């Protein structure tokens, strides 16, 4: 049973969501089960999030797949404008995002706000860089011919993020994918889901179309297994432990996914 209200004193309480974002809708797990999230300083339960299984994760992937053609068809400038609005909204709501982050992750409020600003900078950067994914023209080994290289979005991507930087690692992975026309699924760490969900609220307000960005929560074994085995997911980005990274690499190898791995404390 989900808590009916957030105990946090936010300027905008609607940023605190105890639901997952799938296809533009805020939904619960099919089973009705949820996972409590605790304040590491006090042990107090600050809220609960849905315990998604493979079926719900599959629907998130399908939502991203359905949104992909229209999103990739937009001009890079059009995608950039949406991301710029998201950048502005993150900064405008920095105090609330910092409070959510501190409550679930435990870092000092000043550090949390610093991370929010840092997280926003990734969105700003890729909003502009997405307009410069040019491609290339390469000389051929025959006279009068050239090789044209065109850069295209890979399709649906998945991002699995850690607990220690619950905002910055999401925007660092999400920003470039969205900027170049990919659609994705974000699976935040189970200890720190509310920061990710709040960013999802702001992404909706910025005008991000339904299904372009989906945010799921639930047991890592079930959600991760679907993300790594589903052939629709063409790319996986993971930041976390070397032990878990090895498992994900092995799972992704079966469908030959593109992978980006940032493993261990010295990655």
Where is each model-derived feature located?
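Glycine-rich loop-to-alpha-helix module at the N-terminal edge of alpha/beta enzyme cores
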Residues: 44-133, 144
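Short loop-to-beta-strand entry elements in the cores of soluble alpha/beta enzymes
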Residues: 82, 175, 180-191, 195, ...
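Short alpha-helical
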Residues: 55, 92, 96, 107, ...
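Terminal low-complexity tails and localization/encapsulation signals of metabolic enzymes
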Residues: 1-48, 81, 85, 135-160, ...
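Conserved NAD(P)+-binding/catalytic subdomain of aldehyde/semialdehyde dehydrogenases
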Residues: 156, 205-267
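Structural motif
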Residues: 74, 160, 187, 216-218, ...
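Conserved small-residue-rich beta-alpha loop and adjacent elements
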Residues: 136-210
């Amino acid at each position: 049973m989900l808590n009916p209200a957030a105990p946090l004193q936010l300027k905008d309480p609607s940023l605190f969501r105890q639901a997952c974002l799938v296809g533009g809708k805020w939904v619960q797990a099919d089973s009705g089960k949820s996972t409590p999230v605790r304040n590491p300083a006090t042990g107090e339960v600050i809220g609960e999030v849905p315990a998604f299984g493979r079926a719900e994760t599959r629907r998130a992937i399908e939502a991203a797949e359905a949104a992909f053609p229209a999103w990739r068809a937009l001009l890079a400038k059009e995608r950039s404008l949406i991301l710029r609005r998201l950048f502005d909204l993150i900064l405008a709501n920095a105090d609330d995002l910092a409070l959510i982050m501190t409550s679930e992750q435990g870092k000092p409020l000043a550090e949390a706000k610093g991370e929010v600003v840092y997280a926003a900078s990734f969105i700003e950067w890729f909003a502009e860089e997405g307009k410069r994914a040019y491609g290339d023209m390469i000389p051929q080994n025959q006279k009068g011919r050239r090789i044209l290289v065109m850069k295209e979005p890979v399709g649906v991507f998945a991002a699995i993020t850690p607990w220690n930087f619950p905002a910055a690692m999401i925007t660092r992975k999400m920003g470039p994918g969205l900027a170049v026309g990919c659609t994705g699924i974000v699976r935040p760490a189970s200890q720190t889901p509310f920061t990710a969900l709040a960013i999802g609220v702001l992404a909706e307000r910025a005008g991000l179309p339904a299904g372009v960005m989906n945010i799921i929560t639930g047991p890592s074994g079930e959600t991760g297994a679907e993300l790594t085995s589903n052939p629709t997911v063409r790319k996986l980005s993971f930041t976390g432990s070397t032990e878990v990274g090895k498992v994900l690499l092995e799972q992704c190898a079966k469908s030959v996914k593109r992978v980006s791995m940032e493993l261990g404390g010295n990655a």
